[in-house]
Amino acid sequence: MPIKRFPLLLIFILISFNTISAQFFNFGRNKVTYEDFEWKIIQTEHFDIYYSGEFLEIAEIGAEYAEEAFDEYKIKFNDIVTRRIPLVFYNTHIQFQQTNITSGFIPEGVGGFFEFLKGRVVIPHMGSLEQFRHVIRHELVHVFMTQKLFNIQKDRRITNRKMPPLWFIEGLAEYWSYYWDTQAEMILRDAVLNGNFIPLKDMLRIYGTFLMYKEGQNFLMFVADEYGEDKILKMMENIWRFSKFEDVIEYTLGETIEEIDEKWTHSLKQKYYPLYQNKFPHTVGSNKITEEGFNFSPAI
């Protein structure tokens, strides 16, 4: 699996099950801006936070979330971002879709993005502070990872910069920004039990999908449990050694990619397959009582 290069200019977080990647840029269409934004700024120790309208209270909460994440990530990454980080907050997703920070169209399923060239993080408030915190933390993982990888390769005078594959980038952002919640559990359990789970070597088949995010997150949870949390950082620190990320994984974990993949897959089967015990397919274990129409409110 070749390592992805820096032309990945925008890194997105998905907030739905839609298959969304950089492919959503629609050429030949014009982005319409409905509102004029009068920007204000909050400056904290590490961030320049831009907001508009009557959004000060939420922006201040976002500032606290960002500083909290900064203190945590400088330890996790064993590195620090020395430049000031611009955070751009929008009051709603509709306003977020009008942003001129990217010329591309932003679908409803995108909950924020990190723009690589100028290092800007752009996030809408969707009405949930928990989700707002999650997205801020997710995007700041991208900021720290980008800085970490840049420093590692700069110190070794490597000019052809390397990046991990998207499943690792997004998987780590999810793993270090949020807990393994019931939605993640539902997605992975469904994939394993219904034959839709994709092993590492075939991860490109689900490139940019919500399943890719959750499989990447779960794989890194597996690495932390099986090989040690420190191995995740080691994979980033070893990226300069190889042209293929599979080789980075093998070198860091000390096993072949096939062995690692098999262990991960087997652990998930052990966890989820027992759920089939005493279960029957609906066509076998139940009787169809209606032939036509839809049952919107079945009686119990």
Residue ranges and their predicted role:
Residues 1-26:
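Bacterial Sec-dependent N-terminal signal peptides
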Residues 11, 85, 171:
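Residue-level detector of short, conserved catalytic/binding motifs and their immediate flanks
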Residues 22-159, 164-165, 183-184, 248:
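Juxtacatalytic substrate-recognition/specificity segment
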Residues 26, 30-31, 39-41, 234-237, ...:
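Beta/coil-rich, acidic/histidine-enriched accessory regions frequently appended to metallopeptidases
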Residues 49, 166-168, 172-183, 190-255:
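Active-site-proximal alpha-helical
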Residues 63-70, 74, 133, 137, ...:
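Extracytoplasmic/secreted envelope proteins and their assembly/folding machinery
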Residues 75-83, 225, 229-232, 285-288:
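Surface-exposed helix-capping loop/turn segments at secondary-structure junctions
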